[in-house]
Every structure is written in structure tokens, then in C-alpha cells.
Amino acid sequence: MSDNEKTTQPASTDSTEPAYRYNAALAQDIEGKWQKIWDDKGTFWAANVNGDLKDGKGRNADGRPAYFAMDMFPYPSGKGLHVGHPLGYLASDVVSRYHRMKGENVLHAMGYDAFGLPAEQYAVQTGQHPRVTTLANIANMSRQLHRMGLSFDDRRSFATIDPGYVRWTQWIFSRIYDSWYDEDAVNPSGSKGSARPVSELVAKFESGEKAIPGHESDGKAWADLDQAEQQDILNDFRLAYISKSPVNWCPGLGTVLANEEVTAEGKSERGNFPVFQRELRQWSMRITKYGHRLIEDLDGIDWPEKVKLMQRNWIGESHGASVHFTVDTADGSKDMEIYTTRPDTLFGTTFAVVSPEHHLLENVPAEWPADVPEDWKGGYATPVEAVKAYRLAAEAKTAKDRVDEGGEKTGLFTGLYATNPITGAKLPLFTADYVLMDYGTGAIMAVPGGDQRDYDFAVKFALPVIYTVKPLPESGDDLANYEGKAPFVSHDGIVINSSVEATAAKGDALSLNGLRVDDAIAKVNAWLESAGVGKGTVSYRLRDWLFSRQRYWGEPFPIVYGEDGTPHLLPDSALPINLPDVPDYEPRTFDPMDAESNPEAPLSRNEDWVKVELDLGDGKKTYYRDTNTMPNWAGSCWYYMRYLDPTDTKHMVEKDEFDYWMGPDHNKTAGKSGGVDLYIGGVEHAVLHLLYSRFWHKVLFDLGYVDSMEPFHKLFNQGMIQAYAYTDDRGQYVPAAEVVEGPADANGEPTFTWNGQHANREFGKMGKSLKNIITPDDMYENYGADTFRLYEMGMGPLAESRPWNTRNVVGSMRFLQRLWRNVIDETTGEVRVTDGELDTKTLKLLNNTIADVTVEMEAMRPNTAIAKLIVLNNHLTSLDAVPRAAVEPLILMLSPIAPHICEELWSKLGHTESLAHADWPKADERYVGQDSVTAVVQIKGKVRAKLEVSPDIDPKELEKMALEAVADRLGGKEPRKVIVKAPKIVSIVPAE
């Protein structure tokens, strides 16, 4: 029998067992009873400051300390939950119950992330409308979670597909769309840079305070521009804007994807389909404007360092310079801006490269310039033909293929030349697909003497190589080791070959020779700014967030377009914009390799919905709805705030409620950042949901809608529950529950068979495709929810992955049975505790357990808390009579982990109120600490003596006592080595 098969084996069902034994059947009765009581009495209702959301006793918050704990809410998939899913939910529930017992007003609720691709794909599989299947899945998942005994305030539950929720998601989009980022404005935290209403930008254009882009020289006023021209200019500033740029097009899914949804292999994260670069018109969000703040504010929140590092690396802040080169095109002189982290190497620039999508390629010459090498032309008769063909070839490649370091470097000459602003050199301008338009400016200056990729390209096309940095003298290295062989790649060294008598831009002399790299960068940046051809600047690896999808199952945009294509934001009174109920909601997908295919949004097929007659203030006109939908990340960007009051129809979140639950310093641990007190979820969301939520929150913070800088003050990443899976000799997965474990083989390893045939065991994830799923429903039926909770919380540290092994579940059941027997006579059902005084040993153990378990609960270490509670319970079992004064604190301490049995025992002990709000036990400090500990003395790893010593004994004193205790075994010789780990271990290595 395999480990997984044992999942279905219940606790004892022996009809001869005592009538009141705690078993699966009794556990189910107790759990059903208490879940109904909790529901009926509103035991876990959190009290708001104002309004109808009061606690179970009809009270508002009334100044009680607030604590807000939540989980990353689930996708309501058709598969339901397996036992790995609730790990985080159970952890947050334990924490929430503990904080209630500390007297805090705890907000703990659960909603459902119901839009997006998973729900749509499941609906496609079942042939039903996404709303029908999603609501059914929510009902099933809600049932499973409720049966687990999670202490949610169910009044606050919602799904992101609820019209009342969609309304506020669209409202937030509207605020972002109607905002721009003012670099000079001071945000509420006191630093520079803030989102401001677009109306303020318009006022700056109208007053002349800010120059109108594209009209600096023609003298046109803002009022002289027509509506379309004004909207085009504002579009370049809005935080939510329409862009026509290279995007990640996935034919296999029929939609575009954000960079974060594309794997390092250039495939879609969902479905593993190829992803291609296509220039399409899409919605984007200007998250890059918040790059520095998103990095800087990580210092003020309590997140795992690995997640902070992942966000810092993903944002990728780098300091360098923007430099303007002049390019003579068929349409006159054009500016080409590049970004470089090494402006000191401008003297070593021997060519330039632009992305195939770069706008300069619209103006290549009709004929090749004289004396162009044939291999620069790519075999084409003219630059126009060459560029057109190269662009088509680049479109057919994935982003990964284009930047793959190991791939062949392709490229061709454009027929254009760029002028170096310092040296005046005419640099041949190439196009190459390894330069991406959405990174930097889509143009690079190539320095083959200091960059391997540029060097390889220069060698391929026989371009000059100029070295501008040599090794530091103290390095022992020499430039001769590189010249003609390889680039010298270093961020430190001495600058060489970098001087000119008269610069092209200013005509002055400039020399960087002899300077260290950092000093040279500072000097050249100052020169660039003084010459008006560049400046020191900051760039980010982070790209603006691609925000539209060609899907049906998502939030519609609150945007319509006029006959001229100008976008118009719908008024808040028109929200929500609901999806039409249509029969044809499936996206049109294509051959996964069809890079030339074009997105076809499902909503575009519904003309009655798309074409509308509206009066937007200037009379009734015909408009056309945007047929894209928002990505599944939209609803999850702000859902934590809706828990504060999902019934509020007037506000996204009311200010008093926000300040109470999430404001800066709203409790002792919230800190300046404010936000949710505890947020539990998987590390896989580090650069997706968590980054997007922080961005939206900061925009709302800047605009004054929320008062905290961050959405989540403390983040905890739970580990993964893993399980065995089994395959037959063909490599196909077989049902784990049908696998039989046989005798060990010659190497002592267990053997397995399925249907009489050999089976192979492997260890990894739990999943439907692996046929090794164990569901909570199995556990409820065969052990009860409390045993399941206790086992899962006791498996190991929460942050670590751990193996599921059903044979160990019975150990958790036995612990609860022993606790039950300590209180209840299994034969009569009577309470068997006594009211006598505690003996000294019990008194000390109890108070030390209270002190230790409190520390473990504060640190979110329920596994070690359980271990200490087992020790206390075992001690009580050994007594002739179990004292009430010891078992009641034990029940209280166990209740966050196994609440149903503890409620039942608490009730049987005569208490009339639920223990959910009982006071957490406090240790009597007079009995905390140990009078002595046992120190083990080892010689060559074997225990040779044990000493009772003070817990704070001096290591030298312990060494002396240990040597005296084993002196006869050392034969009077001085030991070769003594290792003291006071107060518990002394290891001795004797002399030879």
C-alpha cells in the first residue's frame, strides 16, 4: 500500500471502542456543531469604526487595537483544493486566532480572484459560460474552506467578478488614466515625484509653464490644438496610456502577454506556447515612473529578503547617461537618443545599432552609400529592401531568441550614419534583433573594446575596435592580453584613447585620459549636459506594464472611442461597464508558430455592445467601446482594501476605515509604511501581483485616496507541500491511491506495483496531472478537520517545503485523543479533571510552556509550538489526576491550531462563552526558566558522563567540571581538544 493510498484509511472504526472516544465520526460532529455556532453568533466578525459591520456582540471597533491578516486569494478553479493549497490559509488562521486571544480586533476574510485565463480556459473545457463555472467553483471552494474551520468574516467575502467590485476596479483605472507623473511634485511621504491629475498638466500647458511637446518652436498655444492633437500629447504623459510598440504576442493563447508572463525560454507562462515580438496598439501602465520609489520603499517593509532582492533585480535600476546622436536620414537630420551606463566609453564607439522596430528605419536611403562592404548589405539591392526583410525576420523570433547570448548575432547596415557628439565621427548605423525596442531607447552605441557582444558584432562585420580602458596597475593585468583577441570588460580601470582637441558639439577640448572610470563618467556627464547633447540619468530594466488582453473574461475598459479614434473616459456614473452575455466568448487562437497572426478580441464580435450612442457632454454621438479587457492582475491589485467594507457603494475604501485597519502606525508593528499586518502567499508572485499592487497603491497614495505608502507591511511566503507520484514503465502517471508497496529490493529500497505491474516512485509536486492529489475532503471524512490542521501545521517550518506522508497523520489524531482522554472519560463521557493545586514540577512545566509557546506563536512557528504542547499534554497524562489549572491553559494554547476540539473541551469544562476571544495564557515569571539543565560529556562522540548544571554556567567552569567527571577515562593525560557548547554539551578529543 502506498503512502497516498493510506490517505483514505480512517481512524479506528472498531465497534468495541469506548463510546466517547475521540475519532473521525465524533470529530465531524464536533466540527459541524462549532462551525454552526461560530456562524450563528458572528464569532469571527471584525468590527469597523463606523457603519453596519460590527462584531458578533453588535459593537463597533471602539478603539480596540486592529490586526489585519490575509492570504493571497485563490483562483476558483474547477479542480478545487488539495491538501497542499491550505498551508498558507491555515497559517494565517492560526495567527488570526492567536491575535484575537490577545484582545485585538482581527480582520480575516477571503475572496476569490475570479477573472482571467484560468477561469476562461476551464469554461472552454466544460463548454459552459465562465460565470456559471466560476460561481460553481467558488461555491465548492468556499465549502471546503468553511469545513476547515477557518475563522473568516464571511460578510466581507467577494469575487472580483461581482459588478460592485468591477465598478471600483474600473474606477481605479479611471484615476490612473486621468493622472500623470510630475517629477517635481512632492508626494505625501515628502519625497519628490508624484502622480497628479491630468487637469494640472493641462493647466501647465495652457499657462505656458510647461512647453507643449512638438510645439516648442511653432508658438502654438494649447487652445490652438484640436481635441485629437491634445489627446495625443496627453497620452504621452498619462499613467495609463495607449501605445503602439513591440509586445509579446502569443498566437497559441490568442493574446498579448506582459514581460512578467513570459518565461526565460520565451514561452508563455501558462500553456508554454511560443511568444513573438509584434508591434501592436495596446494599453500600458507607466509603472517605470515609480521604479525608484518601488526600490527605495522596500527598506520600510517587513518582507523576506529574497523577495526584496527579486523585486530590486526585476526593476533593475541603473545609473548612466542619455546621449543624443545626430542621424542624417532621407527625411533630414534626426535625433537618436541612446542610454548607456558607461558614457566614459563614448570615445570607443565605432558603430551604433537600433532595434528593427526603431522609427529611424522609416527613413533609410533609397540606395546604398558608396564603398559599403557587400556583407553589410545582407544580399539586398537597397537599404529599403534590406530593412523590410530584416524586420519581417525579427517579428518571427521570440524575445528570448533575439537576446540569447549563445545565438548567432545577425544584423545589417541601414545605409545611415550617426554622428558622435564628442568626436564627430560618422558611425555606421546597423539594425540588429538583439536590440529590443522596449528596453532603453531601442538604440545602443557599440563599444567593441569593452563589451563582448559588441566585439563579436565588430569582428563579424570587420568594424574597428578601440580600447578606452586599461587594467589598474595594481591588478597585475595588462591590456596586451586583450588587444586583437577580446574586449577588456571592466567597470574599473584607467581611461585611455579618450581625448579630442575640439568636440563636435561645443568645439572645446575634452580629455578623460588617466582618470579612473567613475571620475571619467562624472566628467563626461557634466560635459554632455553643458553641451546640451545628453545628461546623467537613471534607467530601469523594468518595462511599462502591458495592460490589455484580447480575452473575454476580464474587466472591460471604461473607455470609448469617437469616430476619429480619440479615446474618451466614461464618467464614474456609467460604471460598472459589464461584460455582455454572449454565446461566443472563446478567444480566437492560432497555430502557436503563426507569428503573422493578429489578435481578435472576442468582444469585437459583438457589434450591439461595441457601438453605443452616448452623450458625454457635447450632445449624443456614436462611440465604440474598447474591445480589450484588463489582465487578471487588475482585480488582485487592490482587493485587500475591499475587505475593509465590500458593502460600501460610495467609496473604494472609506478613509476612517482605511486609517484604522491599514494606516501608518495603526498598531505597534505597522510602522511608517502601514498596510496589511500580515500577508501570506507564494514567492512566485514576487514580480507580478506584488509589484503591480505596490504600483497601484502608490498612485492612489499620491492622489490622496489612501494614507499608507505600501499595501502590505509584512509578507510571509509559505513553503510547498510535496508528495510522491508514481509512473509505469512507459513513464505515464498512474493513480497513487492504487499503488501497492511491496518488499524492499536488494538495496533496501521499497518496491511498488500498480495493477500487478512495476511502478516507479518520484517525489515532487501534488497535482491532478500527477494523479497523486489528496483532498481536504478525504481528510475531513477520515480524520476530521482538527487532525488535518494539526498535522499540516506540525509538518515543519512554514517557510520550507515539506513532504506529505499520510501514515504520520495518525500521530496527530493520537495527540488529540490523548488530550480528549485527559479531560473526558471515554466510557462515560464525564469530565475527569480535578480542581487541586499544581505540584511544583507541573507548575514549572506549564509556565515554561506558556512562555515558549507564546514566543513560537509570535514567530509563526506552530510546528515547534505543537511539540511543546505535546510535552505538556504527555506530562498531564502521567499524573494520577489531570488538574484543571494546567489543562485549561493547554486547551487555550492549542485552540488556534485545533479549534473545534478545544471549543468542545472548553465548553465541557463549564465555560459558556467561546474561547475564540478568551485571554491568551500568561506565564508567571516566577516559574519560568530552568533550575538546571543536563550537560552531556562526550569522548570521541560517545556519552561518558552527564552533569546537572546551571543554565547560565560559565563555559570554563563547565569544561573544568566535565574534565573532572571523566578524568579516569583520560588516563591522567591532557586532552588534545575540548569543545564546549554551554550549557548542554562538552566534546572531548583525547590525546593519542
Language-model regions: role of each:
Residues 2-27, 32-33, 37-41, 126-336, ...:
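Residue patterns forming the tRNA-binding/recognition surfaces of aminoacyl-tRNA synthetases
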Residues 2-10, 15-70, 100-109, 133-139, ...:
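Conserved oxyanion/phosphate-binding beta-strand-loop segments in alpha/beta enzyme cores
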Residues 113, 184-191, 236, 241-248, ...:
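Helix-rich, typically C-terminal accessory recognition domains appended to large enzymatic cores
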